[in-house]
């Protein structure tokens, strides 16, 4: 599955206003659509990540960043053949309760 290393946030530092996490998504990874209650900034370090935002697909590449506003239907995936390494910054901090996944069958 996806590697998640939270540096700042509810688990790492009990911070509720902001979370910062380093992530590595393996080839073929995806998660269910979600409608989060937080803004999420993604900063790509290497590889590519596919993001579906309200039905439109965007591919984020190394060195690029993207903001997805809270309340927007979004799905993150890595359908590519290489790992996707990135940083995720959520405001307020990420929580399993506030991500609102449509079908939480993945971890």
PLM regions with names:
Residues 17-18, 35-36, 79-80:
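Short glycine/proline-enriched turns and hinge-like loops at secondary-structure junctions
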Residues 22-26, 34-51, 89-91:
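Short, conserved beta-strand element in jelly-roll/cupin
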Residues 14, 70-96:
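Ligand-binding loop in jelly-roll beta-barrel domains
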Residues 55-70:
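Short acidic-glycine-tyrosine-enriched beta hairpin
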Residues 30-31, 50, 66, 70-76:
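Histidine-centered metal-chelating micro-motifs
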Residues 1-17, 24, 32, 98-107:
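A short, N-terminal "cap"/entry segment at the start of jelly-roll beta-barrel domains
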Residues 48-50, 57, 73, 83:
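Structural motif
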């Amino acid at each position: 599955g996806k590697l998640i290393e939270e540096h700042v946030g509810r688990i790492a530092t009990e911070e509720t206003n902001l979370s910062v996490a380093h992530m590595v998504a393996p080839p073929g990874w995806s998660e269910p659509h979600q409608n989060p209650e937080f803004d999420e900034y993604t900063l790509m370090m290497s590889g590519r990540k596919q993001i579906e935002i309200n039905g439109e697909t965007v591919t984020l590449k190394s060195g690029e960043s993207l903001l997805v506003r809270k309340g927007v239907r979004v799905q993150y995936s890595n359908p590519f053949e290489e790992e996707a390494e990135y940083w995720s910054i959520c405001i307020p901090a990420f929580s399993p309760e506030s991500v609102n996944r449509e079908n939480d069958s993945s971890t």
